[in-house]
């Protein structure tokens, strides 16, 4: 295994651990044994097969990261009903001008 494939494997396991409800060791994470077995199979594979596995693993890692980020964003911005204009403007980075009462 190359250094980049090991890095990808570690990152996948890290993302799976974050997504897992259990707080135990990484060996208890769903899919841990399967991933290690798949990575061990590629040890003796030809270069084209290894590239295919690495590409698929990086896609899977991207999927896991984006799912985690989506959940985090949903928690921050989940629907709370109608929001005031000032709050929505602040959320998207705008600053509304101050309004003065002319009376």
UniProtKB/Swiss-Prot annotation:
Transmembrane segments: none annotated. It comes from the Eukaryota. One of its GO terms (cellular component) is mitochondrion. Pfam families: Complex1_LYR_2 (PF13233). Belongs to the FMC1 family. PANTHER family: PROTEIN FMC1 HOMOLOG. This is Protein FMC1 homolog. It comes from Nematostella vectensis (Starlet sea anemone). The lineage of its organism: Eukaryota, Metazoa, Cnidaria, Anthozoa, Hexacorallia.
């Amino acid at each position: 295994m190359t250094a980049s494939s090991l890095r990808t494997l570690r990152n996948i396991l890290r993302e799976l651990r974050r997504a897992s409800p259990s707080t135990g060791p990484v060996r208890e994470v769903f899919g841990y044994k399967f991933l290690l077995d798949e990575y061990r199979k590629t040890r003796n594979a030809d270069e084209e097969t290894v590239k295919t596995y690495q590409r698929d693993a990086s896609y899977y890692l991207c999927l896991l990261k984006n799912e985690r980020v989506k959940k985090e964003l949903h928690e921050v911005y989940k629907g709370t009903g109608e929001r005031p204009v000032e709050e929505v403007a602040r959320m998207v980075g705008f600053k509304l001008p101050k309004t003065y009462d002319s009376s």
